[in-house]
């Protein structure tokens, strides 16, 4: 894990989110790398789509909830833009889940469902955090990580016969500028970093779970 205390003032809050994502985000997980390759089994893609639908597909979702609570008033415009984009992402995931068919039969389904519910609740807790910058960091990490997750969704769309749809997120430059401004004090920078770390940890656990399920099916 990145030592944010060492990095301190020398990096912006967005720099910290980006560095955390490179080290601990979805892009670094071997199972996701497999899922976005041509070698991915359709049942594994289906499982991933259904898991993402469970964690991120139900309203309000992290971005919308963070906008609703909006502990950092200066974040509201950026959060609104991200939340609006995720309305489209939820619709896309729902389309993919329908096209992918039922969740593939896998040992330990009850435990999986409990883990996915726990992950969703953890994200809801981040969105409601009263610590200024925490929800901002979680949403910033979600936007950063979603770039890689989108590769999976678009790959699944092609596999299951769905036309990929363009994402509607704010530009990377706009997000970078907003997060840098929102984490411009030592306290808010630490909170942004904490929120981002928690989001990446949830996604890392999700890919670990899906990797274990794929192994159990292939047994």
Regions of interest found by a model, annotated:
Residues 1-32, 110-115:
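Acidic, low-complexity proline/glycine-rich segments
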Residues 2-3, 186-219:
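Acidic, carboxylate-rich catalytic segments that either coordinate divalent cations
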Residues 4, 28-33, 43, 102, ...:
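Small-residue-biased structural context
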Residues 20-70, 125-129, 133-150, 196, ...:
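Alpha-helical bundle segments that constitute or directly flank the non-heme di-iron/ferroxidase center
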Residues 63-70, 100, 157, 214:
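Secondary-structure edge/capping motif, primarily at the C-terminal ends of alpha-helices
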Residues 74-172:
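Active-site-proximal alpha-helical scaffolds that flank and shape metal-associated catalytic sites
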Residues 146-149, 153-156, 178-185, 199, ...:
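Hydrophobic alpha-helical segments
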Residues 170-190:
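Accessory, usually C-terminal, subdomains that scaffold auxiliary metal cofactors
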């Amino acid at each position: 894990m990145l030592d944010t205390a060492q990095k301190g003032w020398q990096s912006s809050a967005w720099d910290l989110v980006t560095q955390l994502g490179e080290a601990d985000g979805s892009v670094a997980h071997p199972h996701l790398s497999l899922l976005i390759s041509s070698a991915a089994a359709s049942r594994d893609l289906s499982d991933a789509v259904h898991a993402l639908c469970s964690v991120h597909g139900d309203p309000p979702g992290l971005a919308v909830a963070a906008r609703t609570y909006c502990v950092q008033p200066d974040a509201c415009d950026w959060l609104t833009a991200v939340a609006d984009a995720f309305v489209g992402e939820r619709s896309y995931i729902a389309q993919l889940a329908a096209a992918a068919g039922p969740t593939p039969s896998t040992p330990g389904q009850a435990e999986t469902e409990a883990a996915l519910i726990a992950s969703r609740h953890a994200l809801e807790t981040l969105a409601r955090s009263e610590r200024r910058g925490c929800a901002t960091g979680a949403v910033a990490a979600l936007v950063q990580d979603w770039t890689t997750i989108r590769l999976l969704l678009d790959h699944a769309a092609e596999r299951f016969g769905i036309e990929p749809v363009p994402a509607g997120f704010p530009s990377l430059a706009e997000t970078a500028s907003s997060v840098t401004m929102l984490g411009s004090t030592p306290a808010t920078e630490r909170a942004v970093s904490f929120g981002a770390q928690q989001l990446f940890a949830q996604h890392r656990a999700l890919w670990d779970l899906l990797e274990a399920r794929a192994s159990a099916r292939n047994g």
